[in-house]
Amino acid sequence: NFLIELQSRDGTHHYARLRVPHNIPRFFFVTSEGDEMEADDPLGNRRIDVVPTEEIIGEFLPLLFPGYQVVSKGMFRITRNTDVEIEEDEADDLLEAVRDSVTRRQWGGVVRLETEHGMPSNLTEFIIQKMKLKPFQVYSVKGPMAFAGYMALNDLDYPKLKDTPYFASFNPDTQPVDKLFENIAKRDILLYHPYQTFTSVVDLVQQAAKDPAVLGIKMTLYRVGNNSPIVKALMEARQRGKQVTAVVELKARFDEERNINWAEEMERQGVNVVYGFVGLKVHAKLCLVIRKEASGIRSYVHIGTGNYNPGSAKNYTDLGLLTSAQDICSDVTDLFNVMTGYAVRDNYRRLFVSPTCMRSGIERAIRAEIERHKREGNGRIVLKCNQLVDPDMIRLLYEASIAGVKVDCLVRGICCLKTGIKGISDNITVRAILGKFLEHARVYWFGPLEDTEKSLC
């Protein structure tokens, strides 16, 4: 945004706000040919001047206000509170309630005002008064604002300045595609994205849609992205006469509108769309395929730590399990019955499900490892997660450390556990992996690393 102080011909002063349009490029690229460049310059014999759009607009502001003199100007940016409360228990139609909340988000309360460094004080004060802000909410920014827009620079054709593209491999057990169900029936397949391609997961749903032996598909959808091949496969499956259920989380933050559009499109195609629970988000990533085979009805399951989004799967590290193990498939079937409103269940055979039994299951595993360490002396816990902030869980890890259990934590984001406290956290190590990909997998491992029976993912 620009705030401009204008003076009319009669000497009166006015203030005008000008919003930089979102539907034009953030930068204009001006190429100069023939400029002298160093021989080893990675850009080659080209020079490109990058001009931010807001600088061009600021330079030509007088053209937008004929008859007025531009006295002063300054750029500012507003950050609003995007947490809009949805009265789910009072809403007759959850979809419409979420749609209304998305509309209201653009009018959320202002939590931060960023102003261009050197912006005239009278302009800053004008905004503060109009928006009724406190001094602590105002930030003077040296340099450009809205850095997310600078990702446009990555579109420049300078491969020498970029990372070498990573090409994922196929897990050999997922090939050939037309034998995928046969291969899963033989043994479990663990996928590690993006090192192994997410295409195998897309193949699973697409094969299920086309396979005449498949009776039905059930799937949870949290963030699926635009032009989703998975959603299209679900709709194709319904068109081919299969029973298809999609549990769509409408309250996935900043993806609400996209999920609403997909949900409505699937409903038009005859897919049974369910919107989850009041007061909870469906964050599990599950796909259940029911298939009629010569030996009877058999289920196949995909359980993942990442969204069913081929786009983000190229940049996030995630794990996915393809299995036809009866106990896991029965658990997933029961869980879908809970999510679609046909059952109540607190405990499962192999799955830890929140909010009913995940906490208690992990706590039992930690306490069991403490007791095993007292007997055998080689206790080990490995945790890989996005955040570690739960006070009770942190205290329990301290308890494990005090007992002598070696605890390794790989935490991508916020970690409230403190290492190096003598006598309390001596046996705990916390690391964060920073690299090309965003670490997103969740793994909890209890017991010696060579003992694979003690792992839980």
Model-inferred region functions:
Residues N386:
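Cofactor-pocket helix-loop regions in the catalytic cores of large enzyme subunits
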Residues K406-L410:
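Hydrophobic alpha/beta core scaffold segments
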Residues N1-I381, E399, A403, C415-E439, ...:
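N-terminal localization/anchoring segments of enzymes in phospholipid and broader phosphate metabolism
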